[in-house]
Amino acid sequence: MHTFGYRANALLTFAVTALAFICAIASFSDKFSNQNPSAEIQILNINRFKKQSHGNDEVSLTLDISADLQSLFTWNTKQVFVFVAAEYETPKNSLNQVSLWDAIIPAKEHAKFRIQVSNKYRFIDQGQNLRGKDFNLTLHWHVMPKTGKMFADKIVLPGYSLPDAYR
């Protein structure tokens, strides 16, 4: 007969293999969910647009953010990290991204929202490149599952521009 150690090892090996298989199936099942998030962002006000003492441009905005991210939630979703970034080009860099606002959405009930907020983080360009600049506001999200691979996506909202003169 087999000893207790051999039997415990066989049972533990089977349990770990079964758990790994169930986790793989759970992760794979997220691929079949229909995800169609929507978002709209409006700039309500440019609170401040100035040149800092050391030469960099700084902007403070009031944003109206409305989004419906409920379709990102499945039975396997733990939480969703969401943030708004301003994206623009300068002569030195083909893509500049500045995070303006972020939040963690813990449940599907909180995934449909509308807020008016000033940018949480400072919108500063390393130089004097923001006057008259066209830029996109992009809503990024990272879905954090209970098990499986984390994934990210975004909605790009183009057509925003800053004034030609400081305020």
Swiss-Prot record:
The chain crosses the membrane at residues 12-32. One of its GO terms (cellular component) is endoplasmic reticulum. It is a single-pass type II membrane protein. Belongs to the SPCS3 family. This is Signal peptidase complex subunit 3A. It comes from the Eukaryota. Pfam families: SPC22 (PF04573). It is found in: Endoplasmic reticulum membrane. Glycans are attached at residue 136. Essential component of the signal peptidase complex (SPC) which catalyzes the cleavage of N-terminal signal sequences from nascent proteins as they are translocated into the lumen of the endoplasmic reticulum. Essential for the SPC catalytic activity, possibly by stabilizing and positioning the active center of the complex close to the lumenal surface. Keywords: Endoplasmic reticulum, Glycoprotein, Membrane, Signal-anchor, Transmembrane, Transmembrane helix. Residues 33-167 are lumenal. The keyword Endoplasmic reticulum applies. Its main location: endoplasmic reticulum. GO terms for biological process: signal peptide processing. PANTHER family: MICROSOMAL SIGNAL PEPTIDASE 23 KD SUBUNIT SPC22/23, SIGNAL PEPTIDASE COMPLEX SUBUNIT 3A. It comes from Arabidopsis thaliana (Mouse-ear cress). Residues 1-11 are cytoplasmic.
